[in-house]
Swiss-Prot record:
Homodimer. The lineage of its organism: Eukaryota, Metazoa, Ecdysozoa, Arthropoda, Hexapoda. A motif ('KMSKS' region) lies at residues 270-274. It comes from Drosophila melanogaster. This is Tyrosine--tRNA ligase, mitochondrial. Catalyzes the attachment of tyrosine to tRNA(Tyr) in a two-step reaction: tyrosine is first activated by ATP to form Tyr-AMP and then transferred to the acceptor end of tRNA(Tyr). The gene is TyrRS-m.
Amino acid sequence: MLPLRRSLLKPLQDVLRHSHRQMSQKNLLELTDRGFFHGIFPDTAAPRMKQLFTRGQQSIYAGFDPTADSLHVGNLLVIMGLIHCQRAGHRPIALVGGATGLIGDPSGRKTERNQLGETVIETNLKAIEQQLRRVFENHENCLWDSKKQKLPLAPLIIVNNADWYADLQLIDFVANMGRHFRMGSMLSRSSVQSRLESEDGMSFTEFTYQIFQAYDWLHLLRRHNCCFQMGGSDQTGNLMTGHELISRVERKREVFGLTLPLVTTEEGDKFGKSAGNAVWLDGNKTSPFALYQFFLRMPDSEVEKLLKLFTFIPLPQVEQLMREHTKEPEKRKAQTLLAEDVTLLVHGESGLKQAERVTNALYKGNVEGLAELNLSEIQQTFQGATMVNLLTEPGMSILELAMKAKCFPTETDAVRIINAGGFYVNQKRVQNIAEVLTTGVHILRNGISLLRVGKRNFYIVRWQ
């Protein structure tokens, strides 16, 4: 598929889009230049890793526990890592933790996770698998040109660790595998130490998590010849435990860990659902418009780093884009391309078009653009807005509309706030309480009116 054409960034964008299609080198460690890797394990293994990456196809896996029914932006960086592996000619494996999700990873957490039931886990698993497949498909369809590449993309492999734990017997597992783990090493992990020093301590359930993640790697090594594991920097301890297990059980095999930086806000807060500020990859939880706006609003101090992490634009073109951006920062060229590429990857061409359509309607005073949105798009955009069904009545005034939609507790409040300029219909301020509603201005041709009181209180009126 040819890339979408967007006039805002022409002619620079033509160069950038064409550059997206160039095949990466097979040595994944070159991504270090993008700030993509936080570290490698063992830390002296770079020469050997380079040799393996350039010698032939390798298998690299990353894990995703089904602790929610959607992945979030923090997970997206790990997905980007797997796609980079795919682009470099290697084989990506996504492990979904149908078993480990029941235990809960203590890494990076101050308290124990709430236990999830098997039914919830199963529902979350299906949703996450669909998201992973959709993101990989969007990349192949929208950001990759197979005709210009020497090698085809290796298909994504998704495995569920519940499949190999289902038939394991507890006593056999402890007897055969438990002897290869050393308590001193396990207790020394930072994720364990921080919890042991806390008031609530750490449960045995959470303590065993690193054992199961280590065994996952051993299983994938044996089944898929998977010598590489990738994860956030908070996974370093778990990667080390897996490396130690394999070095004892499969002494002739070499395995390596790749850790990625944790994505944080400008204030240093983690982008994760536990932090309460999650940006989800599910369009029903975070709409394509909201995802687009999230990246569009990134400060200048962050945008270059995020372009390197969340897009496939080669570094010379990132530098060129930043030079253009520095000359005219008010045009937000860098943020716009970042928002476009991430939205395209997560939601595909239709999601990006929707995000751009809503952006034009809301922020460029385009009433016609607002009229092109359907009810679902408006509801996704204004999540939490009050929904009201009203009958059209000839001669209805602005004041009557506001009261029927229950925008104000009293008519006195309505008159005061409307006269003061605090009431909007379809993103246009209205101050005449006697103004009569007209089709095309107040009532859009899609049969909807968007009301707003102040900056954030939205009401969606669906006319009958």
